[in-house]
Amino acid sequence: MHQVLTRRDLIRAAAAGVSTLTVAQLPSWAFATGEAEEDGRPVPFVDEQPIDPKRPMLKWDDLRDWITPKEHFFDVSHYGTQHVPADSWRLSVEGLVERPASFSLDQVKSRARQEVLATLECSGNGAGADFMGAIGNARWAGARLADVLKECGVNSDAIEVAFWGVDKKKETIRGNEYEQNFARALPLAEAMRHDVIMAYEMNGQPLSVAQGFPLRLIVPGWYGIAWVKWLSRIELRERRLMNRFMARDYVTVRGDRHGDTIRWTESSV
């Protein structure tokens, strides 16, 4: 017999100190229908995913395979979709490297090709009724990031690798406006993993514009915010990148209790 989750259940859970209860963590019976307990009302979970044509999402009922077709893949970007001409596009590698370099798409493709089967999920997936399909599985193919970094020669002072996309927008920082390209960073050890690639193919076909053509960073195990689309610049750094998407947005807040005190800390996703 299925149990019905009511508002009272959620309130009791919250009172008991359960602070991380999310839709994704609820047991399957939480979505069952039935009669509410006396004086209780069922929580109105959405049983049909709303459709927003301006924000493509995975349609769960249409799934027929573990690999998500490109046309069913979700699309999220912060500074708008970018249409980048392949013939004029370049990838620059700079910063703390012995041999700074610039690569055309053909030059990237001339490196050893690696295929990675990985799940891409937006960190906001499940945050609302209209944002329940920001996840998908795909076969990504491209050049290993570590190979390119080794080719350029990583300086011993480097601790982090920052990745910039072509997309940009003016951001307000301390009351002033500055044009900022979208950027994220990885610790050097993560960037050197064998499964981190710069992809130019998805499911055996060239990347679509929405998925980051001509080149996209693929970082299995990290949320989609780290999978930089329309990749155009890589910088080896001796200091942490502290931009909007590393230090202000996309951070988790955690409280650790020490006696009667809770210590709150923020960490990048």
Residue ranges and their predicted role:
Residues 1-18:
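N-terminal secretory signal peptides and thylakoid transit peptides that target proteins
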Residues 29-269:
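Structured, non-membrane catalytic/scaffold regions adjacent to prosthetic-group chemistry
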Residues 12-13, 28-30:
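N-terminal cationic amphipathic segment used for targeting or macromolecule association
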Residues 3, 22, 42-45:
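Detector for intrinsically disordered, low-structure N-terminal pre-sequences
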Residues 21-29:
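Short hydrophobic alpha-helical membrane-anchoring segments
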